[in-house]
UniProtKB/Swiss-Prot annotation:
Could be involved in insertion of integral membrane proteins into the membrane. Belongs to the UPF0161 family. It comes from the Bacteria. GO terms for cellular component: plasma membrane. This is Putative membrane protein insertion efficiency factor. It is a peripheral membrane protein. The keyword Acetylation does not apply. PANTHER family: MEMBRANE PROTEIN INSERTION EFFICIENCY FACTOR-RELATED. Keywords: Cell inner membrane, Cell membrane, Membrane. HAMAP family: UPF0161_YidD. It comes from Bordetella avium (strain 197N). Residues 61-94 are annotated as: Disordered. InterPro entries: Membr_insert_effic_factor_YidD. It is found in: Cell inner membrane.
Amino acid sequence: MIKTLLIAPIRFYRFFLSPWIGRQCRFTPSCSAYAIEAIERHGALRGLWLASRRIGRCHPWSPGGLDPVPDPARPQQKNQGSGCCGNHSRTGLD
């Protein structure tokens, strides 16, 4: 429900205001498309954070270009990876 409430004004902008303003975004996908995808994929809080950061980067001095929404982080599995406390294996060189 919160996602729908956040996405509704973005869709309003895309369909009613954006045609009057013209394509101004320097990025692909556009900032409004990025915001919708970020909210749908990452949830309300993280999606808004990602969208806000993207809009902050969209200015006349930005080179723009391809900037897709990052993939959601997968939860780390216990005792996997290369942390200070993971993968304790003895090599016989102790």
